[in-house]
Structure formats: C-alpha cells, structure tokens
Amino acid sequence: ETVKFFSVIQNKLHFAATGMTAAELIQARADHQLPNMGLTSWKKTEVRKTDVAVAKNYLKEKEISELNRIVVMWLDFAEDQARRRKQIFMKDWEGKLDEFLRVNERDVLPNAGQISRQAAEDHARAEYDRFSAGRREFKELSAEKDYVKELEKTAKQLPENPKREQKKHDKK
C-alpha cells in the first residue's frame, strides 16, 4: 500500500509539472534515435539500461525547475501540518495534494494515466537495446578508424623503399 501511495503521489507531481505521468514521460521520450536516447541526465558516464526507466531522467530543465518548486511547496505544507500535529492518514494525503495543486493553479491528475508503468518500462528497454546496439557499432567503427590512422602513421615512418635500403646494407 505504501509503494502504491508514493507512486500515486509521484505521478500527481509529475503531471502537475509536465502534464504527463511518469510512465507517459518515459513512453513519450525514450527514443533510440535521439542523442543519449532522449535522456537529459543519467548516473554514470554513459546511458545505461537502469537509467531509461526513470522518468525524471527525461525532464527538461524547465520541467525540473517546476517539479522542484512544487515539491518544495508541498513538503513545506506537509511539514507545517506535522508541526501543528494535524493527524493526516496516507489515504487523506492524496486528496490534500489535489487540493494543494488546485489552490496553486496546477494541473491535477484525474486518473491513473494512459500508460502503465510496465508498458513504459518495456518500451524504454526495447528502445535502449536498439540504442545500445547503435552505440556499440559506432564505437567499433571509431576504433577501426583510429587503428587505420595508426597504421598510416607507422607506414609513413618506414623507409620509402625498403629494397633499396637493403641493397645499400648488403654492399657494405
């Protein structure tokens, strides 16, 4: 129940900032043809499969700013409720968030969204597999080009006519 609660809250916050749920963001933006698969942030030096199933990794700078602003206001509200010893149960927080978003003239998620979490993750992983294959091919081609350049550089350092050099050596 707790996991579902936080998932609902997260989706409501994403929707208020972007007009899409987390799953809808992933479904709409995971694209193997885009640079870094459409992600705007990821954990390591390059995009990994674990990064593509995280909705916030696709957010644009303005959306991140909006989401952060909403979350900070919401947490301040929740902290104020706690300090005043207002007893609010998890089931009530969902309604409180909807009220909070309306008061702040934000979009309120009317339902669970159009895309399931599983469908979004499946889509993102399939796109990642295509992206990863293309990235691997690009790296292999780059390595081959570097290898050819090294061979050409080494070839230029060789004597121009090795047979002529050999004859000079034989006469001595």
Question: Which residues does each PLM region occupy?
Answer:
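Positively charged, phosphate-engaging catalytic surfaces used for nucleic-acid and nucleotide handling
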Residues: E1-K172
